[in-house]
Amino acid sequence: MAPQWMPQNIQKRLLKYILQQLSLFSEIDLPNLDVSLGTSSKVNLRNLELDIEKFSIPGMYMRSGSIETLSLSLTISDGVNVDCAGVNITLTPSLTPGKPNSTDQFSLAKSTADLANSVMFEDNVVEDEDIKETPSVDSNPLPPEIKDYRMSNMMAKAADMALSRLQLTVRDVKITMILETSHMEVCIEKVTLLSKEGTRYITVEGMTLNAIKPEVYSGEGVDNVDNSEERDETESEESEDYDDELMQTSFMADNKDDIHNSLMESMMFATQTSESVYMSATSNVFSSTTPRASTYENHQPSAVCVAYVSKCSVQFDGLQNIENMQVNLGRIKIAASPIPECLSSVIQSIRNLVRLSAMSTNETAGNTEKEPESDNTTLLNTLKIDEICVSFESALLKDGNFALDNTTCLSLSDIRFEQKNASFSFGSIAKIRLSRNDSKTELFCFDDSRAPNVADLGLEILNNDVSRITLICPKSLNIVVDEHLLTLAARYYSLMEPVIETLISVISTQTPYSYSNTHTSRFALHDTANNQKSNEFHAQTSSIHVKLQLNDFCITITISPITYDSQEGRFDTSSILFEYNDPTLGEQYASNQFLMISNLETSSAGVNKIRSFDSSSLQEIWLKTKIKTIVEKATLKLNFDVLIKIISSFGKLADLVRKSMVTSLPVARQKKVRMGSSLFLNATKMLKNCVEIKHCTIIFSHICPHFGDLKFSLKDIFVNFLQDGTLHSYVMSVLIQRICDSVHESLLEAADPRNKGYPMMFAKFKDNVGVHFKNCSFNYYGEWITLLESRERPREETNQSSSASSATSKKRQVNFTFADVSIGLVPVNLKSKIEVVIKKGIADLLIGTDGRSKLQSSFSSLTLLLIDDVANILSDKESKSLRHWINANNNHAIWTLNAILKSKGFVPVSYISSLFLNSTFESERHLEKRMTQAFSGQKIFASIDTKIHADALAVDLCADSCQCLIQTLKDLKQPVQFSFNEKYKPMTDEVDVFKDVDETTFSASVSVDVDNLEQTEIPENEKLEIVEDFFDKNLNSDSAEQSAIRSGSLSNSGTKSGAMSNIIFDDNHFGHSGEEFTTKVIPMAIGVSISNVTIKLYDGYDWKETQTTIKNAIRRVEDKAAKIGDNMNEVTEGSTSEHVRSVSNDSTELDTEAVNELLYESIHVGLLAGQDPQSFYDNINKSISNCGGSENVSEHNNLSPGSSSPASVNTANSTRSAASSHNIELGKVSSRRVRLKRSIYHKVLVELENLDLSNLTMVNSEPHPTKNSIVFSEDESKDDSELVSRMDLSVGSFKVVDNVPTSSWNMFVGYLREAGDKELGSSMLHAVIDTVRPVSSLAASELVISVSVLPLRLYVDQDTLDFLTRFGEFKDDRFTLPALDEEEVFIEKFQVNSVRIKLDYKPKKVDYAGIRSGHTNEFMNFFILDESEMVLKKLVLYGIPGFARLHKMLNDLWMPDIKRNQLGGVLSGLAPVKSIVKIGSGFKELVAVPLKEYEKDGRVIRGLQKGALSFAKITGGELLKFGVKLAAGTQTILESTEEALGGDGSAVRLPGYKKNTKSRRRTSPSEVIYATSRERSLFGHNTMSGAVFHRNSFDSYGEEEEFLEGAPALDGAGTQDAEQHQKSRFLVPAVFKSTAELPDVLESDSDLDDYYDESDNEGQKIVSLYSNQPENLNEGLQTAYTSLGRNLDTAREAIVSASTRAARSGSAQTAAREFAKATPIMVIRPIIGTTEAISRTLQGGINILDPEEKRRSEEKYKNTKKEAG
């Protein structure tokens, strides 16, 4: 040590030299240096600047460093004491990538070596070093030399001796990290360095991490106002650190050489000595920013405390090699509130640095050298942390305390980490807990009851060839989640999510540049096994218990131990259990398990191929994923009330969480470049994750009383998360059932269980939601509505919540797609079922922000199928056997849903080609806005407005299926019932009528009159005179009111007194209700529009129950009649001839005894005693097939609608019963089998065009009065009625076509052409039905009906009328609904306009029994009506109790009017009278026309000409018509005669006539009819050679009718030749072993006969001789010539055929017989041809005189030319 007499200047320079050797300080100014050398030497330095060149921190660059005061105290006893204060260091990230080389490393060994060199006075070494370290100005500097700072033994001993007596104390340390968008600050109160016995001890006290920029939220408990005043002056002096110029000179430099180059200019212009060149450069820079520093000082942001460390102790051994390092940290406190914003700004700066670093890496890649491998010495032996406390809400003060104590804090206590050796390390956390101090509840903790001394978390790290990390949680974990914690987590999630995404993007951006450094291909896969060691991570936890605390209940989640293995990429747990706990139940409080997830496993090893489906076409595609989660089974069983409670609580919780989530931080994201789509890029999509649930069961119990449980069974559920954020989910199998005791009702199931190739449900979630349904069968149960209505629902809360949610929600769109979907409709009381099959359909649901929703949907190919009893539905196995019968060779046939349902027993009854359904759901707020902006024309606004449009509707019905369909549709919902008291209020509250009467008012007058009573008494002898005229003598007679009702109008009551004269009657009182609307909002409006409706009515019956019932009734009648006949025969044989003669004389007076039965109120089966039972089968078969002519009459048996009364018993002269129903005419067939199935061809066709139906529901409330008030309304003058609903039906045009084979007429009902063309937009039928409540407070409702009909043209054939009567009167008790309300509907008012009718009527039989019974209407059947005209007058009726009474009143009012006033118009249509009337009108024209012309202009000659012309036209036309009738009558007689003699009769005129054509029938029950390959199949358009004929085919509905009408009849039963027989094939279904088993499958042995015979019999139709009329005389002559030639050819063929057969016979007798058979044809056929030629010629002449006659004939008669075409 230097002596005391050494000069002060020399001492300063000596100390300066020593300090410079420490490589710590830059140039030291001597004025700031105080030295006092001696035994107790002291050195004081002020305002020291650190040498930034000597400091090199990996990844960091020191921009500046300074020390305010530094004191060195050197004593002999205490050694060296260094005390620093006010240390300020500013750092910035370095752009130099990779690890620093050895020359840039700063260590304690380097500084110690410099100190040792200074002690040994090796000046030459320092000079050489300065020369070597002088940077070159060259742009390409050489790499610096690597210097080893290993000391010699002497130097090491000297350094160790020096450090052993060194004590370093640093106070007020401030380290500032400057980033591009963030400034962070670390403040340390005190740092102490001691050395004892070779061990270094470093102690850091009071370390704080502050965030300066940007301004962040500090947390709760402090005022977040700028606290810049609290900052000291030294902070403001550092404002120059943020200047942009300095950022450009140092921060943006790549390395230190660039920094030296940037400072060359300042070196050249330095004014100071060479020792302060660097200071002069920096001083110039700082001086330039001095003015700005003063302005920036006022806007300096306040520092927000982020973290605080109370104490940190570091202990290590060694000097050059640090060993046995032990780090002990005290209590660490962290405020979590500012962390998200700080991380966001830091990561944003780091991302920019990474981008610049990656660019500079390419330039310096060639200068990199391989670093030596690090040794395996352990640097850190022990790390201990007393506690880490994180507050998620409170702010952190500068003194290290939280501003608030009652906040949510995470505490990690006693953290230890030890490194045993270089390959093994372990650590633990003793206690982990999340608590809230206000409630003293632990939200996150581990169970210490079993092992209190075991740490909560354990960690092991093993570094050998494989780096293995093992994380163990040996204790069970308890987590309590409440609303506060959930909202807090949601807030931090919303803040941290963009930060994490940005961090991931920063890490991922380094990967492409690392590829470029190695000069490899961008798409090459790198061998990671050779470059780095593989890492493994294993985790094992104990059970986890999560308690979700809601309002008044909680949900507990128990998770079984979780294991994770990174090598296999497997994360699994055995079970996850959810329990529901409700403490409000009191003693019944118990945990209920409601959800169980079994065997959850997540795999992330390798790439898995996942089967999926395209979101638009549902085509199969394959995707790839690295993460796949599989759940073996998930079971949910929950009470429905609890489910509603949970959903409500979660809804409120979701709203709370949504409100707590803040807007994401403005993190600048890197702009993504979208590449165009290509086939290569879209070849295989990559998924983020795939979740598969193999089986899921959901059960909701106790939904409502008597409902049972609702069970969901889902199989093979897949949820795919795509990279673009899209979520795809699909379910392969879905089954939803209602289970109540033994009842299992399916709500949703697979329509075809065999079709498993496509998912039943597919959903796509992105911006919009898309849902696809395929092969699904939905079922609607009417009973469910009744059961679910019994459940009470809080309406007000739901409305409020829905309105609140709709106000905050955004626009959403849900797209639905349907393919091969069926909807089953099950009624409430009936056993029938309707299936609606939808082939394709789409529906778009748009949910708006204003509460308005809109549904737009379209469906194609809708088929409605019906079955009478669900018990008759065949199982899949049974129906599958029938399918094999149809197509036995194809085992992979694809069956449509229509075919499958038909094979199960359903009958198609309706078909719609396309259907459009649009619905609008309006909110009250939106409707009020529309009402204010509405036009004057619109007065009604519906909350739900539905419009349905269909292009074409086809309906095919039989009598039984028609009733079944109507009753089933009516029974789809239980009608609303009201009690009698709710309807009419028969009881009222008692009223004290004398309550306000003063009893003393008339007391005085009474007393006065008492005195004079004697004067007013009547004498006893005076007789009382009674005025007889006082009472109305006509009270018992018909009053004027009754006659007014009959005439359709009302009149006065006719009372003589004038007391009621002041009452004013309003005739339109009942018409006011609802006719003039004010602007109002109604609940619902439904509009249905159908362009074309076709209704086909078939004969026969669809249901097997109906057929069986009729067959059994026939057998019973047959047996009874046979017994009676046997008894009569016995009586006849035992009687004498006289007795028999007396009985025969009385036979004309007594009817033969008959056996009768009435079926379905429309079928009357009757058989005379002793009659041949064969007639039953003949008549029934003939009735359905109608193969006979119109003249056939059955005299002794019938199958008729009517009753079994004695009046309906048929005699030998009667063909009808006494009832209004008609018999079914029966013919003769050889077989006794009955064919009752649906006929192939329809009998009646109803065509409707432009059908519009609108239904307005005005009131949605249902009054249930509870008070029996006296008056209904306070204001009696006010109308208290209420319009409940209005139904408006309009039909543009309708026509009923007659297709009965025995009827030659074409149209049954249509528009009357003579009335003129219809107006555009007018409707043939318009009906308005209003449902009103006369008293709005009562539930009783009435109807107001208004009907208008345009003029009608009727062509009524009696056979068609019988069919329609029998069809309409059919009633099966199975489809009769229970009479819940026996009261009939009351019709308040009925109004119908006058209807003009022109009628043609053709009777065919007369019911004489009905005439004898008094039914005078039966006399109409004696006359044929032709163009009879009548008018049904306008009627207005009031107060009608039911529709039956309405029908009777209409008949009683219209018929007398027609008989009284319009009898002439009716009689003018009689065939004998019509010609006379026409000729009379001609004579009238002959006289009237000249008179009219004379009166007009006085010209007589022109008048006579016009009159004569009119007379000739009318008279000539009638004479020609008379000639046509005469010729036609003659032809009819001749054809009947020919047919009776063995000819073909009128059948020759039928199109497609073939001589001697017979129907093919089975001769035995075991015979199967064959189809040759040349014939067309009955099952479809495709030819099926060898298919067994079966009418009930299973192909798509709608195709059968097209080919059946043109199908050829089956020819030849036993006359098939050998060649044709060889071409046929015999096919037996695969399920049958022999043909003998075929009858067992069918329900009766006559089923096959039902199918074959009808095709032949129904093809034979009667053709009128007036049809196909020629247009003019020329065409008439051509037609006459053709018909004459045809008949002559027929006669010639008969002669040739007879000659041929006679020549082959070889005997004269046979030849004579053959010629005798052909003689009638040879004689009669030429005469028939002549009469037909005359008739056709005359028809041509008639059509020339009156062209309208041709159109009338085409309208009236069937046109065989069109049918043949």
Swiss-Prot record:
- Which biological process, per GO, is one annotated for this protein? autophagosome assembly
Compositional bias (Polar residues) at which positions? Answer: 1188-1206
Per the record's keyword annotation, is Lipoprotein included, yes or no? no
Q: What Pfam families does the record point to?
A: ATG2_CAD
Q: Kindly give the membrane topology term recorded for this protein.
A: Peripheral membrane protein
Give the similarity note: Belongs to the ATG2 family.
Protein name, UniProt field: Autophagy-related protein 2
Which organism is this entry from? Pichia angusta (Yeast)
Q: Which gene encodes it?
A: ATG2
